[in-house]
Amino acid sequence: RSGCDWSSDVCSSDLLQSCGFQPLYNIESLSGFIVNEPNNKSESSLIIYKGLDGALKPLSTSNNFIISFTIDEQFEDIDIREDEKVLRKNIAISVKFSIKKEIDEEEIFTGESLISSAYNRVAEPYANFVAEQDTRDRILLLVIQDIKRQLALFKKNQGK
C-alpha cells in the first residue's frame, strides 16, 4: 500500500473517534458475565445456555454479573384455509433474563428477547418436522445474538 492510503486510514479512524463512534463489541464487552444453568432442561433452554455460556467470559474476581433466564415457546397455526388445512405455522420464542451483581445478588437489569418466524406446511410429515426444527434453531441463534447485544450495551452503559 502507498503512504497515501495509510494516511487516509488514519484520518478516517481519527474522524470516527472524534465523532464519538465506538464499536459495540470489543474484547471486554462480554467479559464479567456468568450465566446460570436453567432449571428447565428443555432442548431450547440448553441451546440458549450453551450459546451464552460460550460467549461470556467471567472475571477472576467476584465482581461478575449473574444472568438468569426463562424461555417461553409458542406455536401457532396461521394461514388456515376454509377446509381447515393449515398452510403455515408460526413459532415465537421469548427469553426473559435478569442481571444481578455477584457480590450482593441485587437485580440491576431485566430484559427480553422476542423473535418469531413462520414456515410453510406441506403434506410430508418429515418435511414439516425438518422445517420446524430449522425455524426453531434459527430463532434460537437470533435470540442468543440479541441477548449478547443487550449485554454489551448494558456493560457499555455501566462504564458511564
What kind of region is each of these model predictions?
Residues 9, 32, 64-66:
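A residue-level signal for beta-strand positions that form part of recognition/binding surfaces
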Residues 136-160:
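C-terminal or internal capping secondary-structure element at the end of a domain, subdomain, or sheet
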Residues 20-25:
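N-terminal membrane-targeting segments
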Residues 53-55, 59, 63-112, 116-134, ...:
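Surface-exposed short loop/turn segments
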Residues 15-18:
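C-terminal motif of bacterial Sec signal peptides marking the signal peptidase cleavage site
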